[in-house]
Structures are given as C-alpha cells and as structure tokens.
C-alpha cells in the first residue's frame, strides 16, 4: 500500500509542476521554445542564448 501512496504523491507533485509552469516563468528566463515562456513573452535569441522576452511585434 505504501508504494501506491508514494506513486500518488509523485504524480500529484509532477502535475502541480506542470500546472504551475506558466506562472513561474519570468522575463529573461532561458527557454527552448515559446512554450517555456508565459503567453505574453516569446522565446527570442539575444545573440548567445534564447530567453523569454516581450514580442517586439511585426
């Protein structure tokens, strides 16, 4: 029974991490894609690395 409890707790923690993903992203955080950033930011290159930045627009 205790193994199931551990698995349950792990799945809850993992789900919480995924659910909290967009809220903990901040401006200038390193990213691999736009999904790593909040909706108002985009994953843009500043020369060396990609970071979450405001979309400069068209």
Curated annotation (Swiss-Prot):
Proregion positions: 17-26
GO MF, one annotated term: calcium channel regulator activity
This protein's UniProt keywords: Calcium channel impairing toxin, Disulfide bond, Ion channel impairing toxin, Knottin, Neurotoxin, Ryanodine-sensitive calcium-release channel impairing toxin, Secreted, Signal, Toxin
S-S bridge residues: 25-38, 31-43, 37-52
Membrane spanning stretches: none
Superkingdom to which the source organism belongs: Eukaryota
Places the protein is found: Secreted
Any single Gene Ontology cellular-component annotation: extracellular region
Domain remark text: The presence of a 'disulfide through disulfide knot' structurally defines this protein as a knottin.
Family: Belongs to the scorpion calcin-like family. KTX subfamily.
Chain's role: May inhibit voltage-gated potassium channels Kv1.1/KCNA1, hKv1.2/KCNA2, and Kv1.3/KCNA3. May also increase intracellular calcium release through the activation of nuclear inositol 1,4,5-trisphosphate receptors (ITPR) of cardiomyocytes, thereby causing an increase in the contraction frequency of these cells.
The protein, known as: Putative calcium channel toxin 196
